[in-house]
From Swiss-Prot:
SUPFAM superfamilies: HD-domain/PDEase-like. Its EC number is 3.1.-.-. Belongs to the YhaM family. PANTHER family: 3'-5' EXORIBONUCLEASE YHAM. It is an enzyme of class 3 (hydrolase). Shows a 3'-5' exoribonuclease activity. HAMAP family: 3_5_Exoribonuc_YhaM (MF_01427). Gene3D superfamilies: Hypothetical protein af1432, Nucleic acid-binding proteins. One of its GO terms (molecular function) is 3'-5'-RNA exonuclease activity. This is 3'-5' exoribonuclease YhaM. The keyword Hydrolase applies. One of its GO terms (biological process) is rRNA 3'-end processing.
Amino acid sequence: MAKGIMLHEVGEQVDQYFLIKSSTKGIASNGKPFLTLMLQDQSGDIEAKLWDAKPTDETTYAAQTIVKVIGDVHHYRGRNQLKLRNIRPAGENENVSIDDFLETAPIPKNEMMETVTQYIFEMKNPNIQRITRHLVKKYAAEFMDYPAAAKNHHEFVSGLAYHVVSMLNLAKAIADLYPSLDRDLLYAGVILHDLGKVKELSGPVSTTYTVEGNLLGHISIMVTELSKAAEELQIDAEEVLILKHLILSHHGKAEWGSPKPPMVKEAEILHYIDNLDAKMIMMDRALERVKPGEYTERVFALENRSFYKPTFHQ
């Protein structure tokens, strides 16, 4: 099996198959067209440029195409890139499939669903429990398959469920320390806060934003879903209003995409643990790619900072 692209060092040659995650056309300073390809395997992805692109190349090297690549890893503007020597589409007889290139969550889907189901089972407030169970059941397949984002954090198969399970464990630890928190409300907020992404995003492969995702966003999508669920279940209670508030406020600030700031305790904690889990996985993924004593590439979503891996972290 070929070494994952994230394990290759600068100067090494690469000769392996990739899945094209995205393909974007550009015009070089000499006026000639080129394609920026994001090439993906199970370890991560790397950018490559296809210079002097022909008109047919846009179709030949479109997203979700499997390609055979020969190239060299080099460093450019703080990030690794792949300098292409040769690229071609994979043939039908080459025994490769899209599944071979998809990064997946480290916990099996059935285990994650069992965890989510157990947290719902433990809820004591019937209104919160019924709404949460209803929406999880409605979108169970997508919930277990979709990434949590198109980029930046948990952008892999089952990333949404993995993000939620990690946050549930954080929520439990915090609620153990601060018993005044409403566990049912906090757990429901964790489970539902990003569920609108099953409509906002296109799916787990070559993830992009849907029309609904671009025009509405996952927050407003989920508020609408909550209203529908409450109506179908004939629940007319304040819990519905507070759950909507948790969804609307989980990004924390208007400049981060929240229509409202957190105004109940559980909304504040939901925002913190969402932010914490997203940042932790971004740091961990960046640090996995470097050796002790080295700095990571700059992480745009973390104020474009680099992170250092101490030499005693062998």
